[in-house]
Amino acid sequence: MSRQPILDIKGLRTVFRTRAREIVAVNDVDIVVNPGETVALVGESGSGKSVTSLSIMRLLARKVGFIDAGSIILRGKSGQTVDLAAIDEEAMRRIRGNDIGMVFQEPMTSLNPVYTIGDQIGEPLRVHRGTSRREALEAVVELLDRVGIPDARRRAGQYPHELSGGMRQRATIAMALICNPTLLIADEPTTALDVTIQAQILDLMQKLQSESGMGMLFVTHNLGVVAEIAQRVVVMYAGRIVESGPVKEVFRNPRHPYTMGLLRSMPRLGDATEMKRRGEKLNTIPGMVPGLANLPSGCAFAPRCSFAVEACHAAVPPLASVNEHHGSRCIRWQEIAA
C-alpha cells in the first residue's frame, strides 16, 4: 500500500466574517492522514475541531466562513492530488461524497426525513457514477447488510424515523462509504449513542477501514474512543494545534498542560463510585475555552494553566518538536513531563 498521504493539510486558516470583525476559527493547522490510518482530532467544544472538518469538506456557511490561507491536498481514488482549498465549488461537488465521505454527529439531522434510506444512500452512486436507480438499490442493500442492518432490503424502503438511533448511524456510515472514498471524516459519530451501540459502531468503522484501506479523520472529545480507534492524535485548543503525535506516546507522556488536563479529567472504571464514597470530585480543567473573538494574548491556554509564567502571556508559542513524531505548543514542555 502506498504511504503517500491521502490528506496533507498545511497552514490551514479559516475565518468567519461578522458585522464587526473577522474571527479566526482555525489557525495554522497542519494534519497528515496516511492510507489505512486513523488520526483523531480532539479538544473541548469550541476548540476548532468541527470547523477544521467542515473546511476540508468545503461546507462552511457561504459568505460567512471562508478559508483564508493554507492548502488541503487530497490524493483521490485516481492517485492524482488536488488542493481542496483552491478549487471551485463545481469541482468540489465531484469530490464530496465520492473521494471523501463524511459521517456527522446526529444522524437524525443528517438524514432527510422525506426520502427513504435506500434513496439517500444510493444518491451518491447515481450522481457520481450515473448508476441506475435499480442498480443503486442493489448496491445499497448489499452495503446495509455489510454495516450490520438486518433485513436490509426492507430497511432500504423505510424512512429515517422508522429506524433506531444505532441503525440510523449505520445508515449514515453506509451513505458515506457507498462510493468507496479514500478518506472518511467522522465528526463525533458516536456521541448521541449509548455505550453499547457506540462500541458496535467503532468496531464497524475499524472493520470497514481494514477492508478498504481508507484513511480516517476521527473528530471527538472522548479520549477513551481515541485510545481504541486511532494511531495518531491531534489536540486542538482555541483554533490551534497544541499537541500532536502517536496516541500511545501522547497519552503516556503528554507534553502540553491542556492534554494533561484532558487525560486527568477522564473518568475511569470505578472512579465515580469510590470518589463519591470519599466525598471527592472528578478532576476538571479550571475555567472555560475562551471565545475566539476575545482570545488572551500569548498562549490561549495560559489563563487556565497551572504551569503558566509571564513569558506565556507574551507571544503564541511555536509548535516545538519533542521528537521526530511528537510536537507540543508549550515553552515549558521539557519541564512538565507527567
Curated annotation (Swiss-Prot):
Highest taxon of the source? Bacteria
Binding-site positions, ATP: 43-50
Q: Which controlled-vocabulary keywords does the entry list?
A: ATP-binding, Cell inner membrane, Cell membrane, Membrane, Nucleotide-binding, Peptide transport, Protein transport, Translocase, Transport
Q: Record's Gene Ontology CC terms? A: plasma membrane
Q: What is its EC number?
A: 7.4.2.-
For the biological process aspect of GO, one term held by this record is: peptide transport
Q: Where is the ABC transporter domain?
A: 10-263
Enzyme kind, highest EC tier? translocase
Q: Which Pfam families match?
A: ABC_tran, oligo_HPY
The membrane topology of this protein is: Peripheral membrane protein
What is the annotated localization of this protein?
Cell inner membrane
Main localization (coarse): membrane
Coiled coil ranges (UniProt) are none
- Its Gene Ontology molecular function terms? ATP binding; ATP hydrolysis activity
Cited CDD domains: ABC_NikE_OppD_transporters
Its family remark reads:
Belongs to the ABC transporter superfamily.
**Could you describe the subunit structure of this protein?**
The complex is composed of two ATP-binding proteins (BOV_A0347 and BOV_A0348), two transmembrane proteins (BOV_A0350 and BOV_A0351) and a solute-binding protein (BOV_A0352).
Q: What is this protein called?
A: Putative peptide import ATP-binding protein BOV_A0348
**The species this protein was found in:** Brucella ovis (strain ATCC 25840 / 63/290 / NCTC 10512)
